[in-house]
From Swiss-Prot:
Family statement: Belongs to the nuclear hormone receptor family. NR3 subfamily.
Gene: PGR
Known tissue expression: Expressed in mammary gland and uterus.
Pfam families in alphabetical order: Hormone_recep, Prog_receptor, zf-C4
Protein name: Progesterone receptor
Region Mediates transcriptional transrepression (in isoform A), annotated ranges: 175-314
The UniProt record lists the keyword Cytoplasm: yes
């Protein structure tokens, strides 16, 4: 800031000999510390004292106007605490003002004599605004102080139109008035609304920070009262050394009749002296220059809201109430047991019923992070060994039965209502029961847990939901031909190993007959996993896991139960041959192949083989070709959503297999006799080699359909296409008749039945073509009908050779996979149920149940031939992948058929009536993407 000076006060200026009131403006970075003014060096001491008092009263009210940035300077003869006098020097460059403004400025600056005409407007600005208000002064003091006849400081009040109305009163005794009476006497007036004329806004001095001192010795002294407000004015000017825009505040002038009349009572939050409160500066911000005492000490009488303004900026904003979070956190850490997922109330609060709240509903900030992770902690859905299973773990021992849950997963035995809890939280299903714990005071002892685990199915499932890799004993499975065969129960953390066929039959004999050949293992009479939830969720990604159930023993000529090399869970990676670490993503693999498969599937890499897609993938060369390695992972049945299992233990596996196996007869020479022995093991059981539903599918299979093609005539494009259309019409009628006999199809709405047939008739026809070509000619030709068989030569001569090559891929896949008739029948039904409208079906629930039932039948059909967990899972992957690939293949047939139908007259091709109706009504919709294909695997 530019230092402004005034003339020496000792030089006589007028005829009366009165000293000139030329004040000296001090530098902006200086402030006085509230010390007593030293005696002026003028010859007229009483007049100087009176002038200083009046100037203090005028300066205390000057900042009260929000638009007034003029900070008056004190007199030029004032001395600082260090004893250095400030001699004022005139400023010749300041413009002169008119006499009336000069008189007003002189009156406001406590000029002891009449104003001179040659002084600038800044000469009448005392610097008393930089000192704290006196005991009797308030913030409501007027900016333009009138002069009483008894006070020779000023002869008349200001005439500035922006000034407030002034009252006649003496300003001399203001310094001696007691506290609390400021503004009741001669020193009261309204707030000034703007700066005086003649002073440009750019030349107005800026206020100082509340805690910044201009004097060297003032930093160590504590101010008795806060000085001027250290806030930013409306114009945007901030004090030097202040925290900046964080401490924004605008002192408001007193309004209303009281301010106009001169009475300005202190605000409720103001100090006793009338000074407005200064916001407390946050200690986390850079401290301004000044004493720490002034920075930290709030103004006397200030409300906490005003003094701790900055503290609210750093308070963390939580999504829930602090009381609720505190009670919730304490309850989660201290709860010992929980009942149905409800939470215990905080200490000292009455319990009340409420909707159970899951731990996942609360943000991470509500739970304290564990400083030291516990070795015995495990996830609520993790794998552990209940004591009732009687399977000793070689690696963990008894520790697996005594593990305690993580603190944030525990819950209390009661429910409660928190005051700060959101009222609209949805009621969530209860959490599964926790595992038995060995900690002092936690849960029941191991014996009680073991008794609960081995209890009957009438009791709660309890710890039976949490099981290790295999379970030795279980309840009989549900009866019926459509019983599910899950790999694991929802909530279970491991893959369940079922009994073999004979063992399943024997265990089910106590409860009743079961028509299924290989029944899955039951757990505490818990309902088996329905495929409606597991298969139809997210594009059916988890359907292959149930194949791990079909691990059956192979009998040979030995006295003890022996299992083939394929049936045992081996500790060899099925991808590269390295040592396997566990069952990852549904397949027994090593850690390297597990990580590779996860990264390859999540990253959606498009690997390309540099060879012929037959690279060797072993422990040494597994990194050479990622394309062949990924292909081998998919062929083995690895699924990205598969659950991970614990490390295999050979002793545990052998004991489990011995427990579930039944003694086999001695001296059986071949496999056929062993199979017959297993079937006739229990005469009371109605055990069949083929499930009844598959037998029913065989019985309703349509008869051979002829195309009526005349093979005596040479093939032409029109005659060949016309014969194929006639064959398609007959096959379409056959599909309608077959679907009416299909179990469960008539339960659907009639519109849904028509829609499914119209969407899938082409898929069913080409799938039947592939099956006939595979069975009758071993996939060497296209066997459309007994009277219409196209070899490769006839395909080349036809006009749709490329289309024939596309259809030829299906019998070649059948030959490669060696598809059985049972598998073909189940896959054919799934093709009928493989495409639905985008908006869904009218009877969507019945459709899902029907589809789930036939997926289970496909599982049973796979289990009739496959003898191991891995082979069954791999087989299911291959068959379902073939069903998914048919969508793209059939789309090419739809496009060719629609183009031929449109150009039928030009091509001289006849289309039957029913087939024409289906093509015209549905093919444009299918090709436009207005249907939803149901895929087993995500692309």
């Amino acid at each position: 800031m530019t230092e402004r000076t005034g003339k020496d006060a000792r030089a006589p200026h007028v005829a009366g000999g009165a000293p000139s009131p030329a004040p000296a403006a001090e530098p902006e970075s200086r402030r006085r510390d509230g010390g007593r003014l030293r005696a002026s060096q003028t010859s007229d001491a009483p007049r100087v004292a009176a002038a200083a008092a009046a100037a203090a009263a005028a300066a205390s009210a000057a900042p009260s106007a929000p638009s007034d940035r003029l900070l008056f300077s004190r007199r030029g003869q004032g001395a600082d605490p260090g004893g250095k006098a400030q001699d004022a020097q005139p400023r010749p460059d300041v413009a002169r003002a008119d006499p009336r403004l000069e008189a007003a400025s002189g009156a406001g600056a406590d000029s002891p004599g009449p104003p001179r005409q040659d002084r600038g407007p800044l000469h009448g600005a005392p610097s008393t605004a930089l000192r704290p208000a006196g005991p009797g002064q308030g913030r409501s003091s007027p900016a333009w102080e009138p002069r009483s006849p008894r006070c020779p400081s000023g002869p008349e009040p200001p005439e500035d139109p922006r000034g407030a109305r002034s009252s006649q009163g003496a300003a001399c005794p203001l310094m001696s008035r007691p506290e609390g009476k400021a503004g009741d006497g001669c020193g009261t007036a309204g707030a000034h609304k703007g700066p005086p004329r003649g002073l440009s806004p750019s030349r107005q001095p800026l206020p100082l920070c509340p805690g910044a001192h201009a004097w060297p010795g003032a930093a160590g002294k504590a101010a008795t009262q806060p000085a001027a407000l250290g806030v930013e004015d409306e114009g945007g000017f901030a004090a030097e050394g202040s925290p900046g825009p964080l401490l924004k505040g605008k002192p408001r002038p007193p309004a209303g009749p009281a301010a106009a009349a001169g009475a300005a009572p202190a605000a409720p939050g103001t100090a006793p002296g009338g000074t407005a409160p200064v916001p407390k500066e946050d200690s986390r911000l850079p401290a301004p220059k000044g004493s720490l005492a002034e920075q930290d000490a709030p103004a006397p009488g200030c409300s906490p809201l005003a003094t701790t303004m900055m503290d609210f900026i750093h308070v963390p904003i939580l999504p829930l109430g602090s009381a609720f979070l505190a009670a919730r956190t304490r309850q989660l850490l201290e709860a010992e047991t929980y009942d149905a997922g409800a939470f215990a109330p905080p200490r000292g609060s009455p319990s009340a019923p409420c909707a159970p709240l899951a731990a996942g509903d609360f943000p991470d900030c509500a739970y304290p992070s564990d400083a030291e992770p516990k070795d015995d902690a495990f996830p609520l859905y993790g794998d552990f060994q209940p004591p009732a299973l009687k399977i000793k773990e070689e690696e963990e021992g008894a520790e697996a039965a005594a593990r305690s849950p993580r603190p944030y997963l525990a819950a209390g035995p009661h429910s409660c209502v928190f005051a700060d809890a959101p009222p609209a939280l949805p009621a969530l299903p209860p959490l599964p029961p926790r595992a038995p714990s060995s900690r002092p005071g936690e849960g029941a002892p191991a014996a009680a847990a073991a008794a609960g685990c081995s209890a009957s199915s009438a009791s709660s499932p309890g710890p039976a939901l949490e099981c290790v890799l295999y379970k030795a004993e279980g309840a009989p499975p549900p009866q019926g031909p459509f019983a599910a065969a899950p790999c694991r129960v929802p909530g279970a953390g491991a893959c369940l190993l079922p009994r073999d066929g004979a063992a399943a039959a024997a265990s089910a004999g106590a409860a009743g007959a079961s028509p299924a050949l290989y029944q899955p293992l039951g757990l505490g009479a818990l309902p088996q996993l329905g495929y409606q939830a597991a298969v139809l969720k997210e594009g059916l990604p988890q359907v292959y896991q149930p194949y791990l159930n079909y691990l059956r023993p192979d009998s040979d000529a030995s006295q003890s139960p022996q299992y083939s090399f394929e049936s045992l869970p081996q500790k060899i990676c099925l991808i590269c041959g390295d040592e396997a670490s566990g069952c990852h993503y549904g397949v027994l693999t090593c850690g390297s192949c597990k990580v590779f498969f996860k990264r390859a599937m999540e990253g959606q890499h498009n690997y390309l083989c540099a060879g012929r897609n037959d690279c060797i993938v072993d422990k040494i060369r597994r990194k050479n070709c990622p394309a062949c390695r990924l292909r081998k992972c998919c062929q083995a049945g690895m699924v990205l959503g598969g659950r991970k299992f614990k490390k295999f233990n050979k002793v545990r596996v052998m004991r489990t297999l011995d427990a579930v196996a039944l003694p086999q007869p001695v001296g059986i020479p071949n496999e056929s006799q062993a199979l017959s022995q297993r079937i006739s093991f229990s005469p009371s059981q109605d055990i069949q080699l083929i499930p009844p539903l598959i037998n029913l599918l065989m019985s309703i299979e349509p008869d051979v359909i002829y195309a009526g093609h005349d093979n005596t005539k040479p093939d032409t494009s029109s005659s060949l296409l016309t014969s194929l259309n006639q064959l398609g019409e007959r096959q379409l009628l056959s599909v309608v008749k077959w679907s009416k006999s299909l179990p469960g199809f008539r339960n659907l709405h009639i519109d849904d039945q028509i829609t499914l047939i119209q969407y899938s008739w082409m898929s069913l026809m080409v799938f039947g073509l592939g099956w006939r070509s595979y069975k009758h000619v071993s996939g060497q030709m296209l066997y459309f009908a007994p009277d219409l068989i196209l070899n490769e030569q006839r395909m080349k001569e036809s006009s749709f050779y490329s289309l024939c090559l596309t259809m030829w891929q299906i019998p070649q896949e059948f030959v490669k996979l060696q598809v059985s008739q049972e598998e073909f029948l189940c896959m054919k039904v799934l093709l009928l149920l493989n495409t639905i409208p985008l908006e869904g079906l009218r009877s969507q629930n019945q459709f899902e149940e029907m589809r789930s039932s036939y997926i289970r039948e496909l599982i049973k059909a796979i289990g009739l031939r496959q003898k191991g967990v891995v082979s069954s899972s791999q087989r299911f992957y291959q068959l379902t992948k073939l069903l998914d690939n048919l969508h793209d293949l059939v789309k090419q047939l739809h496009l060719y058929c629609l183009n031929t139908f449109i150009q039928s007259r030009a091509l001289s091709v006849e289309f039957p009536e029913m087939m024409s109706e289906v093509i015209a009504a549905q093919l444009p919709k299918i090709l436009a993407g207005m249907v939803k294909p149901l895929l087993f695997h995500k692309k």
